[in-house]
Regions:
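Short, acidic/charged, Gly/Pro-enriched secondary-structure junctions
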Residues: 94-119
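Beta-strand elements of well-folded, non-transmembrane domains
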Residues: 82-86, 110-112, 151-155
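Protruding loop/beta-arch "assembly-hinge" segments enriched in small, turn-prone residues
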Residues: 1, 9, 144-164
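Hydrophobic beta-strand residues in large extracellular and virion-surface proteins
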Residues: 30, 80, 106-108, 149
Length: 164
């Protein structure tokens, strides 16, 4: 049997509400500079976060150990999925980026570029795609190009036009 009273539960509920609504994973867009049209074809992308690279174990006398943080992590990677069009929008993007040195800049929006709470700047991005699978028996799925997006993130935050 629970030991919580309704007053305790209401206190936790009210405290959680004061923190604000939870972010909805789908309420975000990735805008690639020079290829803004791909924002409507971007199904999945990594959301940047600031944190340390890991831990440093610090040994001490008599087997004592402690931890301290490594440097901040600025080189990130994560999954990127782009939905291809019959006109080859993703293939054109990949060819354009490859011809221009393979790197691009991007912005990740909490919202859309027109209406957002805030946005993060992603620097010197490059995409390592996997070859998409095409299957004659699969008439129920769009063609997706998946792979890994590598990028640098320094915590550059852009103020949005939606007041929280």
């Amino acid at each position: 049997m629970s030991v919580q009273t309704t007053a305790v539960l209401m206190g936790h509920y009210n405290a959680a509400r004061l923190l604000g609504d939870k972010s909805v994973s789908s309420d975000a867009m990735l805008l690639i500079d020079g290829h803004e049209e791909l924002s409507l074809l971007t199904k999945q992308f990594p959301w940047p976060v600031i944190g340390v690279m890991g831990e440093i174990e610090v040994p001490g006398p008599m087997g004592l150990q402690s931890w301290q943080p490594q440097a901040l992590k600025t080189a990130h990677q994560g999954p990127l999925t782009l939905s291809e069009t019959v006109s080859g929008s993703v293939a054109k993007f990949l060819a354009d980026v490859a011809a221009g040195g393979a790197k691009f800049q991007a912005t990740a929006y909490e919202g859309t570029p027109e209406a957002f709470h805030y946005a993060w700047k992603l620097r010197d991005c490059f995409f390592v795609p996997e070859a998409p699978d095409r299957d004659w028996e699969n008439r129920s799925q769009v063609t997706n190009v998946t792979g890994t997006l590598f990028f640098h993130f320094f915590g550059e935050k852009v103020a949005g036009n939606i007041v929280l």
